[in-house]
C-alpha cells in the first residue's frame, strides 16, 4: 500500500531552490500522482517571503506550527500517511515519530547520517559521490512554460547587446574573482551587460544591473529570455542546480566554475557546460562570446530527464511505495566506501589546484 496523503514541511518559505523544489513536488504529487499534499510551515520564522506564501496558498492547505515538535501531534490530527522533508541531510531533530519520515538530502553526507524511514539524495551526483549509487536519488524537476517576452526594453538594454545573467540565493554569487572580472569586462566592452536577480550587489555600474527577487514564473522566464547566457559563480558549486537547469531548458548556455567541489550541474550539462578556471579564461569567454552563434545551438540538457513526469515517477518509486526504498535496506559494501573515499580525494585535489589559476 502506497502513501497517499503526504505532509510536506516547507519550514521557511523563501525564493531559494529548496522552496521551489518543495512546491514542485507537492504540486505534482497532486496533479500527476493523484495524491493529497498538505503543507506545514514554521509560523514563528521571520524569514518567509510573502510572495512565496501566496504562491503556496493558491494550491495547498497550509498548516502552521509554533515548534517543530508540534508536528507529531499535527500529523496525527490530519491523518497524514507520511511526512516529507527536504533538508541538508545530517541526523538532527527534524524527524517525527508518529508517521513515516521521508528524508530528502540536499548536501553531501557521510553514510552514518542516513536516518528516517526513507532516505534519498536530490541528485545522481550526490548518490555517486557519497554512496557509489547505493543511496537512491530523486532529482529536482525543471518545468517552465514557453514564453517569448523579455526585459530588455524595461531595463533599457539594446537588442544587440550581449547580456549575461544569474539569479539565486542572495549570497550564491560569491566568487570574488568573477565579480572583479565582470567589472573589468564591462569597462572593456560598451555593448556588454550583466543582470542579477536576488543577488547581493557587488558593484556599481550602469551596465551591471541588480534586481530584487521575484517568485513569479512569468517574470523569471522574461529574465532568462533577456540573457544570452547564464554566468554561474557559486564557489561551492551545486548539489543539484535548479537555476542552471532553468537557464539550460530555456536554451541558454551556462558559464560555470570548473573547480567547484559540488558538481551535479557540470555532470548534467556535460560538454555543453562553458567552464572557466580563473579570471583570464572567464574574461576571454565574455569578450569572445558570439550571441548569434549561441542562439543557433541546442543547449538544453534537462528536458528529457528532469520534466515533472519522469521525476514524479521516481518520487513515487523511492518515497511513496511504502518501504520499497527503506533506509534500513541500504547496504554499503567496502568497495562502495572505497569509491566514496576516492571521490573525496579527487575533490581535495581539485580544490588544491584552484590557486594555480588566480
List where the protein language model places each region.
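A charged, aromatic-enriched C-terminal amphipathic alpha-helix characteristic of glycosyltransferases
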Residues: 17, 290-344
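N-terminal strand-loop element at the rim of the active site
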Residues: 9-16, 23-70, 200
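Acidic donor-binding loop of glycosyltransferase active sites
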Residues: 79-82, 222-239, 252
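Donor nucleotide-sugar binding/catalytic pocket of nucleotide-sugar-dependent glycosyltransferases
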Residues: 116-148
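Short hydrophobic beta-strand element within catalytic cores of glycosyltransferases
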Residues: 253-258
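Short alpha-helical segment that forms part of, or immediately flanks, the ligand-binding pocket
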Residues: 221, 244-249, 263-264
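Conserved catalytic-core segment of nucleotide-activated headgroup transferases in glycan assembly
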Residues: 140-204, 210-213, 217
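Conserved active-site histidine-acidic residue motif and adjacent donor-binding/catalytic loop
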Residues: 65-72, 200, 208-224, 260
Amino acid at each position: 500500500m502506497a502513501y497517499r496523503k503526504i505532509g510536506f514541511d516547507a519550514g521557511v518559505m523563501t525564493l531559494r531552490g529548496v522552496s521551489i523544489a518543495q512546491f514542485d513536488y507537492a504540486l505534482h504529487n497532486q496533479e500527476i500522482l493523484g495524491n493529497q499534499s498538505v503543507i506545514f510551515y514554521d509560523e514563528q520564522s521571520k524569514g518567509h517571503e510573502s510572495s512565496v506564501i501566496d504562491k503556496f496558498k493558491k494550491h495547498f492547505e497550509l498548516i502552521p506550527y509554533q515548534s517543530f515538535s508540534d508536528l507529531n501531534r499535527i500529523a496525527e490530527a490530519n491523518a497524514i500517511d507520511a511526512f516529507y522533508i527536504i533538508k541538508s541531510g545530517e541526523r538532527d531533530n527534524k524527524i517525527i515519530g508518529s508517521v513515516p519520515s521521508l528524508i530528502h538530502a540536499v548536501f553531501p553526507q557521510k553514510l552514518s547520517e542516513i536516518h528516517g524511514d526513507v532516505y534519498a539524495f536530490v541528485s545522481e551526483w550526490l548518490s555517486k559521490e557519497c554512496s557509489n549509487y547505493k543511496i537512491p536519488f530523486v532529482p529536482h524537476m525543471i518545468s517552465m512554460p514557453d514564453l517569448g517576452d523579455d526585459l530588455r526594453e524595461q531595463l533599457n538594454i539594446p537588442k544587440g547587446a550581449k547580456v549575461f545573467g544569474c539569479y539565486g540565493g542572495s549570497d550564491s554569487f560569491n566568487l570574488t574573482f568573477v565579480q572583479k572580472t565582470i567589472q573589468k569586462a564591462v569597462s572593456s566592452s560598451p555593448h556588454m551587460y550583466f543582470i542579477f536577480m536576488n543577488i547581493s550587489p557587488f558593484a556599481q555600474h550602469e551596465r551591471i544591473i541588480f534586481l530584487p527577487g521575484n517568485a513569479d514564473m512569468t517574470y523569471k522566464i522574461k529574465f532568462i529570455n533577456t540573457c544570452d547566457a547564464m554566468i554561474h559563480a557559486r564557489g561551492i558549486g551545486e548539489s543539484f542546480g535548479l537555476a542552471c537547469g532553468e537557464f539550460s531548458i530555456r536554451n541558454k548556455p551556462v558559464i560555470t566554475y570548473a573547480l567547484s567541489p559540488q558538481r551535479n550541474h557540470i555532470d548534467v550539462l556535460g560538454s555543453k557546460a562553458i567552464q572557466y578556471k580563473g579570471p583570464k579564461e572567464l574574461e576571454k569567454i565574455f569578450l569572445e562570446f558570439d550571441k548569434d552563434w549561441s542562439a543557433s545551438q541546442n543547449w538544453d540538457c534537462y528536458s528529457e530527464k528532469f520534466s515533472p513526469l519522469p521525476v514524479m515517477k521516481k518520487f513515487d518509486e523511492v518515497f511513496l511505495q511504502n518501504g520499497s526504498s527503506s533506509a534500513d535496506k541500504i547496504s554499503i559494501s567496502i568497495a562502495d566506501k572505497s569509491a566514496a573515499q576516492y571521490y573525496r580525494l579527487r575533490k581535495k585535489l581539485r580544490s588544491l589546484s584552484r590557486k594555480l589559476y588566480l
